[in-house]
Design a protein with these regions (language model features):
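Juxta-kinase regulatory segment immediately upstream of eukaryotic protein kinase catalytic domains
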Residues: 1-7
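Conserved N-terminal boundary motif of the eukaryotic protein kinase catalytic domain
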Residues: 9-15
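ATP-binding pocket architecture of kinase catalytic cores
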Residues: 15-178, 185-194, 208
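Catalytic-loop of the protein kinase fold
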Residues: 194-196, 201
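Activation of the activation-loop gatekeeper triad in protein kinase-fold domains
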Residues: 217-222
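Conserved small/polar residues in nucleotide/adenosyl-binding loops
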Residues: 251-253
Length: 253
């Protein structure tokens, strides 16, 4: 940090941030400035470091756009610094994650919660409107044949789970019928753009004082593809008043 002009002296107020299911995030201060460090999980996977560095490229490309995202400060691509993991530093986000309890303002006012949904749609529209070529992400993904690859890719993912003990198998009711329908109905026309890859309410940060999305987070599945897949996943995972969702209904069939 000192070599990159990021202050001098010890790291203070170190706190591990919760909310993610895999990667490690620490918030700390140095010389009066706050930072968030993000690295791969404690038990690194084969591609954890590559995924972290890929995220930094995406965040750097979003700088200067109107897409709400954490600001990238610095990147360390030398895993030896932390022993085994690359990492990056980003600006802290003043917001909360809706996967936990909502603040009183949001929990008590249905119009604010309604606005949260619209704000998520607005943030996603801003992401989809970014010209990925203009921001330097022309080679960030392989849009040619992207939609055609999705069904085989995810069927293969299910098959790969067979290596884990006690996995009951991929024979989910209706799986092959749905897969066949999707393959018969692949859109013939679509506009490539930045795809978050896991866009739902737990992967955004909301303002503590209103319904606005202040940052889209957890970009490890991002690529160049059809941005409408993000919209579809948002709708599938959106919880109704009774706590149900399309996604939760499917996994309980």
């Amino acid at each position: 940090m000192s070599a990159q002009g990021l202050g001098e002296g010890p790291l203070d107020d170190i706190t591990e941030l919760s909310g993610g299911t895999q990667n490690v995030m620490l918030r700390f201060t140095r010389a009066g400035r706050s930072y968030v460090l993000r690295r791969g999980p404690r038990h690194l996977r084969p591609r954890s470091n590559a995924v972290m560095l890929r995220e930094t490229r995406l965040l750097a490309a979003l700088a200067g756009t109107d897409v709400p995202h954490p600001g990238l400060i610095a990147v360390c691509d030398d895993p030896a610094v932390l022993g085994d993991a690359v990492f990056y530093l980003m600006e802290p986000v003043d917001g909360f994650n809706a996967s936990g309890d909502l603040p009183a303002l949001h929990a008590g006012d249905p119009t604010v919660r309604y606005g949260m949904g619209l704000s998520m749609a607005d943030a996603l529209a801003k992401l989809g409107a970014v010209d990925h070529v203009a921001v330097g992400l022309a080679d960030y993904g392989k849009p040619d044949g992207f939609l055609e690859r999705q069904v085989p890719r995810w069927l293969a993912e299910l098959d790969s789970y067979g290596q884990f003990e006690n996995y009951p198998g991929p024979d989910l009711p209706g799986l092959h019928e749905v897969a066949a329908w999707l393959q018969r109905n692949v859109p013939t026309s679509w506009q490539p753009g930045i795809l978050h890859g896991d866009y739902h309410a737990a992967n955004v940060m909301f303002s503590p004082t209103g319904p606005e999305v202040v940052a889209i987070v957890d970009w490890e599945m991002s690529t160049i593809g059809d941005p409408l897949l993000d919209l579809g996943w948002l709708l599938a995972t959106w919880r109704q008043d009774d706590g149900s969702s399309v996604f939760l209904s499917l996994i309980h069939i």
